[in-house]
Amino acid sequence: MIDLIARKRPPAGLRPALRASLSAAMQHFGGEEREVTVVLVGDPEIRALKLEHWGEDAATDVLSFPTWEPGDPFMPPHLGDIIISLDTAQRQAESRGHSLTREVALLASHGLTHLVGHDHPHAEGLGFEEGATGEDWQVFHDAWAAAQTGLPAGA
């Protein structure tokens, strides 16, 4: 189940596309019976969260808050929360030449990958969708490939 909370209004069509793509990524991880909360916000909100939890005073595209840690004896029904800044996502979509819907789906798949227990090295600003490679990144590429299968044509 995907609980979608919009604290910043997304454009028409984004919500169903996000649900479909994230559902495909959850199925990829075998987590279709799990729950995830996605919160769509603006830069001020995500900046405040990043400052509070990571000590960095800057907006970002996506933050993940898992409810469990790898190595815990079981995975709970609710995997955690994914927070996405629609402001940052819009800028990134424009610079990458694709839609906001596609960018938000990409960010959600990235956040989900963190929620199921995977991490990646910091890539000096290079995002996984921009060519970051290596074993640690492959799981993120695979999640995005799965998420894309749920996107509507032209998204």
UniProtKB/Swiss-Prot annotation:
Cofactor binding summary note: Binds 1 zinc ion.
GO molecular function: metalloendopeptidase activity; RNA endonuclease activity; zinc ion binding
Keyword ATP-binding in annotation: no
Subcellular location: Cytoplasm
E.C. no: 3.1.-.-
GO CC terms in record: cytoplasm
GO BP terms, alphabetized: rRNA processing
Keywords: Cytoplasm, Endonuclease, Hydrolase, Metal-binding, Nuclease, Ribosome biogenesis, rRNA processing, Zinc
Coiled coil: none
UniProt: Zn(2+) binding residues: H110, H114, H120
Membrane-spanning parts: none
CC cofactor: Zn(2+)
Gene3D superfamilies: Metalloproteases ('zincins'), catalytic domain (3.40.390.30)
PROSITE patterns: UPF0054
Primary localization class, coarse: cytoplasm
Enzyme class, UniProt record, top EC level: hydrolase
Its biological purpose: Single strand-specific metallo-endoribonuclease involved in late-stage 70S ribosome quality control and in maturation of the 3' terminus of the 16S rRNA.
HAMAP family per the UniProt record, alphabetical: Endoribonucl_YbeY
NCBIfam families: rRNA maturation RNase YbeY
Family: Belongs to the endoribonuclease YbeY family.
Protein's recorded name: Endoribonuclease YbeY
Organism from which the protein derives: Deinococcus radiodurans (strain ATCC 13939 / DSM 20539 / JCM 16871 / CCUG 27074 / LMG 4051 / NBRC 15346 / NCIMB 9279 / VKM B-1422 / R1)
